[in-house]
Regions:
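Extracellular/virion structural assembly segments
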Residues: 1-50, 54-80, 89-255
């Protein structure tokens, strides 16, 4: 059975205090506190690397989702990547089973929600060179309550190019600038309550920014993309009286 789509947008890495074990010149930890995957953090040396979040005294972070983008974890031979939590910064426990990244593309994984003061992403020793990481997401995710409508294509792409023509209009050549992912998805039979409590808060706080998108994390965990709303518009028309609909066009750089 397929999983329903989810997005991960409310990133606690942007809100809590962040500390890195080491920093390479030109790759500060502050690069992780936005949504730009081309600005990355990188450590130094060959020892264990880690990134730690601290919610602060008397505060906690609730996390149920880990997202990574703009990284080279697989290429650098990282194994047993771990996400841990703690309440005292001394005793650490696994949020999920440590895993070996199978790709340098987007990674998104969910786990039973944990609420604690500290969280830490641990890169064990044994890598080829210190890996880079552009986006670290930690927080909760927003699940869509229904499946996409018939006709959904998770693989939509468009090539951005520049063409050179002769004076007579003949094609001399085409240069590809980049390939962007463009995904159109429609949802029907959405409850008004979900629209009010889930989609409207997302749109109000995050409608202009990128987010992680996974259309079927259960069967297609490799199809995780960092996307944004092509047209940040809030439109959820009623259908059949009591249900609402949502039509989205999502775009981002095709990795």
């Amino acid at each position: 059975m397929n999983a329903k789509p989810i997005i991960a947008w409310n990133n606690q890495v942007l809100k809590a205090a962040l500390l890195a074990s080491t920093e390479a010149s030109g790759f500060p930890q502050e690069n992780l506190q936005d949504w730009r995957p081309y600005l990355a953090w990188k450590g130094t040396g060959s020892d264990e690397q880690w990134l730690k979040l601290d919610a602060g005294a008397g505060a906690t972070i609730t996390a149920a989702c880990l997202g990574l983008s703009g990284h080279d974890l697989k290429s650098q031979g990282v194994t047993n990547l771990a996400l841990k939590y703690s309440d005292n910064d001394l005793d650490w426990f696994d949020c999920l089973t440590p895993f070996t990244p199978a790709t340098d593309k987007g990674i998104l994984t969910t786990f039973p929600a944990q609420t604690h003061r500290y969280f830490k992403l641990v890169i064990p020793t044994g890598y080829t060179a210190p890996p880079r990481l552009g986006v670290w997401f930690l927080g909760e995710y927003l699940p869509f309550p229904v499946y996409p409508e018939l006709g959904f294509d998770p693989d939509g792409q468009a090539k951005e190019s520049e063409a050179q023509l002769s004076r007579g209009g003949n094609l001399l050549g085409v240069v590809e600038r980049f390939t962007r992912r463009e995904i159109r998805v429609a949802f029907r039979h959405l409850s008004p309550a979900w629209c009010e409590t889930a989609w409207k808060p997302f749109f109000a706080e995050h409608g202009l920014r990128p987010f992680f998108w996974a259309w079927d994390l259960q069967n297609h965990s490799e199809q995780v993309y960092l996307l944004r709303l092509l047209k940040p518009e809030l439109a959820m028309p009623y259908e059949a009286g009591s249900w609402r609909s949502l039509n989205l066009t999502l775009e981002g750089l095709a990795e």
